[in-house]
C-alpha cells in the first residue's frame, strides 16, 4: 500500500487516514 505524509508528518495509509 502507498504511504504519504501530510503537512504535519502524519502517515496517510491507503484505506486508513490518521490525523492529529
Swiss-Prot record:
Purpose of the protein: Competitively inhibits trypsin stoichiometrically at the molar ratio of 1:1. Also inhibits chymotrypsin.
Key word Disulfide bond present: yes
GO molecular function: serine-type endopeptidase inhibitor activity
Top-level taxon of origin: Eukaryota
Record's subunit section: Heterodimer of an alpha and a beta chain linked by a disulfide bond.
Organism: Archidendron ellipticum
Thermal profile of function: Retains over 90% of its activity after incubation at between 25 and 55 degrees Celsius for 1 hour.
Family: Belongs to the protease inhibitor I3 (leguminous Kunitz-type inhibitor) family.
Keywords for the protein's UniProt record, in alphabetical order: Disulfide bond, Protease inhibitor, Serine protease inhibitor
Protein's recorded name: Trypsin inhibitor AeTI
pH dependence: Activity unaffected from pH 1-10. Loses 34% of its activity after 2 hours at pH >12 and 65% of its activity after 4 hours at pH >12.
Amino acid at each position: 500500500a502507498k504511504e504519504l505524509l501530510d503537512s504535519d508528518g502524519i502517515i496517510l495509509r491507503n484505506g486508513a487516514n490518521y490525523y492529529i
